[in-house]
């Protein structure tokens, strides 16, 4: 069981490479990607279709073992120590994995029972649920059935689920997909705030270049899984 460093989690990525079988040989979908992400940074990965955005993020999160290269969390090799480190990692997929026919609070309670340590008391669970609802600005919707939430609210609910276990490292796959511009900006501001106030390193894949000024760092992926840029949003 790995405790998060109070200063947050920094990531060092060295030579991440992935090839898949293709007609006439192999196709490179990650091409020796190396980069650094500082503790508590909010980072967006952008790029064209098929540039390897989600592949890179999944490799960085440790959930894809079929890559070569190394990812270090505060100096610890993520792939070699994944079973120890996975408790500090939150991952929100593009499709919301939440039940529609129960209230938000009930869904969070059931999830907390699974995700939080077994000796957590009911009172501690209740307090944590209230805390994560405040973080994602859904406190007033706690008794709402999930099917009645808007698209943006459902995405926040998915984020709340992953926040229950208090991960220090947080990955999101296209969290703003399908949201209107106002809702998208609101969600981006929430993520930016989480990275600073809750001391979380947040990495997201996005198809849009709107609101990137809210990020600390932008990673641009190019054709063939090549890293084209990694730096401040002001620099590209």
Label the model's feature ranges.
Residues 159-160, 187:
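Hydrophobic anchor residue at the start of the ABC signature
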Residues 164-168:
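A short, proline-enriched helix->beta-strand linker immediately N-terminal to the Walker B motif
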Residues 170-173:
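Catalytic Walker B motif of ABC-type/P-loop ATPase nucleotide-binding domains
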Residues 100-117:
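Q-loop/switch helix immediately C-terminal to the Walker
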Residues 61:
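Helix-to-loop junction immediately C-terminal to a conserved catalytic motif
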Residues 109, 124-141:
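Conserved ABC ATPase "signature" region
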Residues 46-49:
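The feature captures the beta-strand-to-loop junction immediately N-terminal to the Walker
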Residues 70-84:
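ABC ATPase NBD Q-loop/coupling interface
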């Amino acid at each position: 069981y790995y405790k998060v460093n109070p200063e947050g989690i920094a990531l060092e990525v060295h030579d991440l490479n992935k090839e898949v079988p293709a007609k006439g040989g192999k196709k490179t979908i990650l091409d020796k990607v190396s980069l650094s992400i500082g503790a508590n940074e909010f980072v967006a990965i952008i790029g064209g279709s098929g540039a390897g955005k989600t592949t890179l993020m999944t490799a960085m999160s440790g959930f894809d073992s079929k890559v070569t290269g190394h990812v270090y969390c505060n100096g610890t090799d993520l792939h070699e120590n994944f079973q120890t480190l996975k408790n500090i990692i939150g991952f929100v997929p593009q499709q919301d994995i939440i039940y529609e026919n129960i209230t938000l609070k009930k869904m969070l309670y059931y999830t907390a029972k699974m995700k939080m340590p077994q000796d957590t008391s009911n009172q501690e669970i209740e307090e944590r649920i209230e805390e994560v609802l405040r973080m994602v600005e859904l406190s007033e919707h706690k008794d709402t059935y999930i099917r009645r939430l808007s698209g943006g609210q459902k995405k926040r609910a998915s984020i709340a689920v992953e926040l229950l276990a208090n991960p220090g490292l947080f990955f999101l796959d296209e969290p703003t997909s399908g949201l209107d511009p106002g809702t998208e900006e609101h969600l981006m501001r929430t993520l930016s705030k989480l990275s600073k106030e809750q001391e979380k390193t947040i990495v997201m894949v996005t198809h849009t270049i709107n609101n990137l000024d809210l990020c600390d760092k932008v990673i641009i992926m190019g054709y063939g899984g090549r890293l084209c840029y990694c730096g401040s949003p002001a620099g590209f």
